[in-house]
Regions:
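Positively charged, low-complexity intrinsically disordered leader regions
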Residues: 1-62, 162
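Glycine-rich phosphate/diphosphate-binding loop of Rossmann-like nucleotide-binding domains
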Residues: 50-65, 175-214
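Phosphate/diphosphate ligand-binding glycine-rich loop within oxidoreductases
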Residues: 40-48, 52-175
C-alpha cells in the first residue's frame, strides 16, 4: 500500500481522488479473496458512537480483530462525559469536556479514532431534534474539530453529510458484482418515510457509483 494514505484523516470520500479510492477497494477485495493480508498487531482503534450502530460497529470491531488489533467502542454521554466542540462558549450546560482537550489525550493512547455523529438520525417515536439549518449541519463541526486536534487519523463512521466507509463498501460491491462498472447505469430509489432521515448514506452511494464511472 502506498504511503500516500498514511496519517490521513478519512472524513469525506471527496477528500480523495477516485483513483485513490479505487486502489483501496482493490486492496480490500484482494484481502477478501485471501490473496493479500494486512497486519495490525498491537494497534488500537477507538470508536465513538454518538448514534446507534450495528453494521458499522460490527464491521469495524471484526476487522480489527481479524487483523490482529483491538477496538474500543464508547458511547459519549453514557460511557463517557458529554463533549463540546465549539470554541468560546460557556460550558454550563450538559458538556463536561471540550474536544480541544479530549482529542489529543485520546489519540495519544490509540492508533486511530472512528466517530459516528449524525444529528439527523431519528430514534424510536421521537422526532428529530434539529434546530440548525442543513447548511450548518453539513459542516460536521464535531468530527472536524476532533480531527483538527487529533494526533492520529480520524475516520468518519457516518456524519450529517458523509458516510465514507459506506462509499468504499458500495464501490467494492459494485466492482465485485459487475467487474468493470464504468459506463453502466446505477439507479438509487427509496420509499417515503414519515420521519426525517439522514442523507449521508444515499449521498455516499451516489458518489460511489460516480467514482466508478457509472
Amino acid at each position: 500500500m502506498s504511503l500516500q494514505y498514511r496519517g490521513r484523516h478519512f472524513l469525506n470520500s471527496l477528500d480523495f481522488a477516485p483513483a485513490e479510492l479505487r486502489t483501496l477497494v482493490e486492496v480490500a477485495l484482494r484481502m477478501k479473496r485471501g490473496a493479500e493480508r494486512g497486519h495490525l498487531p498491537g494497534r488500537i482503534l477507538a470508536l465513538l458512537f454518538f448514534n446507534a450502530s450495528v453494521r458499522t460497529r460490527v464491521s469495524c470491531e471484526t476487522a480489527m480483530a481479524r487483523l490482529g488489533g483491538n477496538a474500543i467502542a464508547l458511547t459519549p454521554g453514557r460511557d463517557t462525559w458529554n463533549f463540546e466542540d465549539r470554541d468560546g462558549v460557556v460550558m454550563d450546560q450538559n458538556a463536561q469536556e471540550h474536544v480541544r482537550e479530549l482529542s489529543p489525550v485520546v489519540t495519544s493512547m490509540v492508533d486511530a479514532v472512528g466517530i459516528r455523529k449524525c444529528d439527523l438520525i431519528t430514534v424510536g417515536d421521537a422526532k428529530t431534534a434539529v434546530t440548525e439549518s442543513y447548511a450548518e449541519l453539513k459542516k460536521d463541526s464535531f468530527i472536524h474539530a476532533f480531527a483538527r486536534f487529533s494526533k492520529k487519523p480520524v475516520l468518519n463512521l457516518e456524519s450529517n453529510a458523509a458516510h465514507p466507509l459506506q462509499h468504499l463498501a458500495d464501490m467494492a460491491t459494485l466492482v465485485e458484482k459487475l467487474g468493470e462498472p464504468r459506463g453502466k447505469k446505477y439507479v438509487l430509489s427509496w420509499a417515503w418515510h414519515p420521519k426525517s432521515l439522514p442523507v449521508a448514506t444515499p449521498h455516499s452511494q451516489m458518489l460511489a457509483a460516480a467514482d466508478l464511472g457509472m
